[in-house]
Amino acid sequence: MNKQELLTNGRCKKKADRETVWPVVIMNFTGVYAHEVFARNNQFIWLDCRHLSGTRGYCDKEGIRKLKRVIAGYPAEGIHFIDSGNYHYLTKLWTDKLRVPFSLIVFDHHPDMQPPLFKGMLSCGSWVKDMLDWNMLCKKVVIVGASDKLIRTVPEEYGQRVSFYSEATLAHEKGWRNFSSAYIEGPVYLSIDKDVLNPASAVTDWDQGSFSLQELEELLAIVLRKERVVGIDICGECS
């Protein structure tokens, strides 16, 4: 499933006889999307974030307030392109808009559950932990494709709400059904960091995983068929 196919699947059924097309939002921090063909669509919403200082990797309270103002007029129910992995913490800001209990499925080579280096800062390495600590509507987090070494650093107290799975565990529909019935609660928000892919499939700013593009596409197709997905974001552009 390439970007265009993902956009084509960016629809949700409100009722059996009515389909709502999600907005596609591009958050422009580095200018990278200007060089990508898929983004040349005049129906996409471009949010210019290039003027915002103090947002790369780490974001303080003032930066968070500014970013919340930028996205205030747009729903979590959409497809959000959020630039490089340095801005993956934006998933927290988008999902804070959801008003129903949900599960978060993250495709990422990193668990993003480190304690922040600076108190009160939201970061690309701590945002999943922050979601679990502060968003009571986030019932479960599933992280797919994370490094085994990094998984071992996740504090044990999060074990009841966080699960880790490899592509091999889930890459068929029966496996997904069994997994979903045991671990997914409610609708699903999908967050994809392209560093889950191997270097032959994508170039990112971070160390990368072992998924091929085809493997990721196949698993995403299963999730989109089997779950009620209420929002999607994608990061991992090479800045």
Roles of regions detected by a PLM:
Residues 2-239:
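Conserved alpha-helical scaffold segments that buttress catalytic/binding sites
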